[in-house]
Amino acid sequence: MGICIYYQGVLRDRNRLFDLTMAVRAKCREWGWPHRFVNERIVGTMEILVDHGSGGEDWKWEWETRPVDDRWRGIVVNPPGCETLYLTFGRDGRLIAYKSAPDRQPGHYIANDLLYVKTQFGGPERHIGICTLLRLLEEYGVELEVHDDGRYWETGDREQLAHQMEIINNIIHLLAQEPQRLAALVLGEDAGDFEVLDVEVGKVFREPKPEWRREWGISAEEN
């Protein structure tokens, strides 16, 4: 639950990637946002979500396993309080993120070219900052498609964004503070067996690297 920004796109002129990355780095340094560069050879197999159909009755998404030999470059940003922002590109210029599958052998990846970043617990200013970085990508020739749950990308309305975030925060805190009461409303008599977990609202989870990769460096040059 929470406000997210969804984005996909392609960089037609890949000669502009270096300048684009440096421009994003400059903003991250200005704001104090953690970031790292990526320049990796991705070889093996990947699982990727594929759109089958054109939105009609037979439309569906399916995971497919495919061979992959790609060069993955760009910058990965960690806006405080938000999920990871991948501004990274494959050899064909598409925005894409690769993650090593934690339960598989080396050389198997989860790939995603339909990207999103959750900003609910980062607040309006960091949400706006992420939109600023995406606009920066457009300045360097990235053709973007963006959907913003907070509508800031489309409207530039900070007050509307802050209001939507506040409403969702209130709902989340209600769910966290009165789980037994809510369980009783939903489950009735069965609520007595409802287990309440001790969770930290707003905590950002970082996916651990698989055991075989934890001694690697951040990136590796293409062979």
Indicate where each model-derived feature is located.
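Acidic (Asp/Glu-rich) sequence patches and key acidic residues
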Residues: 1-223
